Amino acid sequence: TCFAEHSFFIALALAKAHHKAFKLYIPETRPYLQGAHLTAPAAAEMGYETALITDGMPAHFMGAGRINKYITASDLALLDGTIVNKVGTLENAICAKYYNIPYYATSLGADINKKNRQDIVVEYRDPNWVKEIQGVKITSSSVGALYPCFDVIDSSLVTKIITPEGPLCIKAQ
């Protein structure tokens, strides 16, 4: 099996092969902290300048003009241009659209069995993950929590879906 970040790292490797240099602002990606534990260290090991930021900071850096492209992996891509990715992606995509920043999603390919967002069921995971960080409780046990693990990003927010074979041709619905 592979995880969504493979497509992201393929894109980084191709950019590196074409001598592209840029700084990466990488959100920590709560609650599992994949950005902090996986993405940022791997990008730094590839030689990219990286800045680890909290999940709430992308809007700040987009508004300040320090982010000029928004690029993510995707857990799922549809032929209509819909993207499914980690929770937090939707708010960043909306913010990118607001600041006229292109949003590129990397994908290993489209799921031809799903036609549109109505075919997607967003999984909710254990809400206790939101109430702790790496096993340390950060709030009272009397506080409720919700943990949808994926966002569904509308095609109107996506500039292009990039696959190893090239850009995915998005079909209008």
Model-derived regions: residue spans:
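Short helix-capping segments at alpha-helix termini
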Residues: 17-21, 45-48
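Histidine-anchored nucleotide/phosphate-binding helix
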Residues: 5-19, 93
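Short beta-strand element of Class I
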Residues: 24
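Conserved phosphate- and dinucleotide-binding cores of soluble alpha/beta proteins
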Residues: 27-173
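Gly/Ser/Thr-rich loops at beta-strand to alpha-helix junctions
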Residues: 1-8, 31-32
